[in-house]
């Protein structure tokens, strides 16, 4: 708890370009959470280097992502928006927690198996211990809640196990986090393969709408979205492509899927797909305009980076010093 508010932690990797799915499924919902929670939103650039990165590209993407947080409406005065790499406590606590994590637990992590298969030429220790760093990210700020998707639930369970194990030995040091259960964001699927989630790492760029795509690109991708030969707009699992487009249109317009189906009753895909494109363009234009404005204000973004790193460091240091004292590290001489 900070100032009577529960603490919420979340973050995104500075790899690839954020998609419409990232925005509608997570980022858009983060904006309102500061009314209820003390929020820490990190650009988790340390996680990004488990895969080889071009240094200049990583640096640029990290800044763009932090700027996008603000452009999306996350107030940097109410929320702590920072680079993970600017707070050394993440790495320090990660090492300590790794000494309270069992190899068998990490071996069971399905994401490691998936990523190792994709990057067989670079199966590094960082990829294997990724969930421990994620646990440190969360426990460092004594987070009460963490918004997670199904693919990250296993990592949160590991975080809880590590926290409980540590607390059983040393007393109530860590808050044991819960999964955030609130408004469910739209789950947006690939435009080219609606059985897969829309992803910034999709090898087919036509499968994802990126937040910085121009209107012509957005419209082209929507018109080329994979559908079916039935020709009728119905919200059902048997038509995954159309169901996905209905979800996108509904999320962008604030309508329910049933209302969307009713609106386009009797109309074909040739009318529906451009309407989806227009809805997406309307949602993303204000975000794109604000991102462009903020990107030109280097001094402002720099000030946010500095102030928020200091705030994050303040709270992380409180936890880290407590942990260090509990496990027997010598006190610092000041």
Language-model features: locations:
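Conserved nucleotide- and phosphate/pyrophosphate-binding catalytic cores
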Residues: 22, 154, 160-334
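Internal, conserved structured core segments that host functional sites
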Residues: 114-166, 170, 190
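Short, histidine-centered active-site or binding-site loop motifs used for metal coordination
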Residues: 12-14, 45-47, 144-145, 202, ...
